[in-house]
């Protein structure tokens, strides 16, 4: 594939660092915000509401890299080398933010890295805040497909995450049988580990600006109060997206939605 030369990569990295830190000011007590959730769960939206913080997102780096190369992100060009380079750039942004004692928002779907970061940053005087994005897995899946049809690259990330961790099984949160799961297996496991390690956390329902649960709240009451989406509404939305994909000649999107509908019908 087309790629930047070594000196061009250095220029690109410096530009990304400068853009990430632009307009941000140091903090006497800097905070590291870790945002956790599957693709399509609203992490980027929540990140945009946190003031005066350097956002670290490999997905954003990859998108900017594609623009620099003049590649259409719809072609899903990302390969392993691009992913590694995005990690290198993200690390440079992180080091610059820490050096300047700036607040940091860590936006990622790579869950295994998050605990490492939460353990690492306090050494540099950072307090940590863990924010979990709770979203119905079918809602997230359709968000991702819709974003792909809006020329976003999220579909491939979502597919990779689901292939790695698989579909959730059972009913871990005690949901009613006519509704779909509210967390993926990966995020659920992450939450359990976070609690075991003693990390205070906040849980956000999709589309809400304020947390629905904070450490110390009654978790059972939180579960009872969740605003679940009936399967019928998922199926209605899926049909609309299928028609849109069909009319646009997007065969891959159409087949993805067909498979999603089949699974929803089986769980209805």
Question: Which residue stretches match the model-derived regions?
Answer:
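N-terminal pre-Walker A segment at the start of P-loop NTPase domains
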Residues: 1-26
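Conserved nucleotide-sensing/catalytic segment adjacent to the nucleotide-binding pocket
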Residues: 54-55, 60-119
């Amino acid at each position: 594939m087309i790629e930047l030369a070594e000196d061009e990569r250095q220029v690109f990295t410096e530009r990304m660092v400068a853009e990430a830190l632009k307009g941000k000011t140091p903090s006497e007590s800097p905070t590291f915000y870790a945002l956790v959730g599957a693709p399509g769960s609203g992490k980027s939206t929540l990140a945009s509401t946190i003031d005066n913080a350097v956002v670290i997102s490999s997905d954003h780096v990859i998108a900017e890299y594609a623009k620099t190369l003049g590649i259409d992100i719809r072609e899903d060009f990302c390969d392993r080398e691009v992913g590694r380079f995005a990690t290198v750039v993200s690390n440079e942004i992180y080091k610059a933010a820490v050096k300047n004692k700036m607040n940091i928002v860590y936006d990622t779907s790579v869950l295994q890295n998050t605990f490492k970061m939460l353990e690492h940053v306090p050494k540099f005087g950072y307090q940590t805040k863990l924010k979990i994005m709770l979203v119905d897995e079918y809602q997230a899946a359709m968000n991702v497909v819709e974003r792909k049809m809006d020329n976003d690259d999220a579909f491939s990330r979502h597919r990779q995450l689901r292939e790695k961790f698989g579909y959730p099984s059972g009913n871990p949160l005690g949901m009613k049988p006519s509704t779909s799961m509210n967390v993926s297996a990966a995020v659920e496991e992450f939450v359990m580990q976070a609690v075991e390690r003693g990390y205070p956390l906040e849980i956000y329902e999709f589309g809400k600006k304020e947390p629905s649960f904070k450490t110390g709240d009654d978790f059972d009451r939180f579960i009872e109060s969740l605003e679940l989406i009936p399967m019928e509404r998922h199926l209605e939305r899926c049909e609309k997206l299928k028609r849109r994909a069909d009319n646009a000649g997007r065969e891959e999107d159409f087949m993805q939605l067909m498979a999603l509908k089949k699974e929803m019908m089986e769980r209805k």
